[in-house]
C-alpha cells in the first residue's frame, strides 16, 4: 500500500467550520486552494480565490478527492497567433 493511502486529506479547519455553519445558505469565500473536497461539502457553493477574484464553484459528488485549486485557473490563456 502506498503512503498516500495512509495520509488523511488536508482540509482547512476554518473552511470546514464555515461549511457546517452556513449549510448551503450562503456562498462561502475561501483562499485555501490546497484544501481537498470532502463529502460534507456536496451541494455548497464555495468561492475560491485565484489571485485576482473569487471564482464560485458548485461542489458535486464527482469532485470529491480533488483540490479546490484544480477548479479555479490562475492564469489566462491567450491563444497562439496563426
From Swiss-Prot:
Pfam families: Ribosomal_S19
Record InterPro entries: Ribosomal_uS19, Ribosomal_uS19_bac-type, Ribosomal_uS19_CS, Ribosomal_uS19_SF
Bilayer-spanning residue ranges: none
GO biological process: ribosomal small subunit assembly; translation
Localization (cell): Plastid, Chloroplast
Keyword Plastid: yes
Keywords, alphabetical: Chloroplast, Plastid, Ribonucleoprotein, Ribosomal protein, RNA-binding, rRNA-binding
GO cellular component, one term: small ribosomal subunit
Matching HAMAP family: Ribosomal_uS19
Name of the featured protein: Small ribosomal subunit protein uS19c
The organism of origin for this protein: Bigelowiella natans (Pedinomonas minutissima)
Name of the gene: rps19
Amino acid at each position: 500500500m502506498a503512503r498516500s493511502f495512509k495520509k488523511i486529506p488536508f482540509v482547512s479547519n476554518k473552511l470546514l467550520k464555515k461549511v457546517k455553519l452556513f449549510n448551503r445558505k450562503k456562498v462561502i469565500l475561501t483562499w485555501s486552494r490546497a484544501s481537498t473536497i470532502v463529502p460534507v461539502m456536496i451541494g455548497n457553493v464555495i468561492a475560491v480565490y485565484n489571485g485576482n477574484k473569487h471564482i464560485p464553484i458548485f461542489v458535486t459528488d464527482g469532485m470529491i478527492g480533488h483540490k479546490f485549486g484544480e477548479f479555479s485557473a490562475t492564469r489566462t490563456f491567450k491563444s497562439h497567433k496563426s
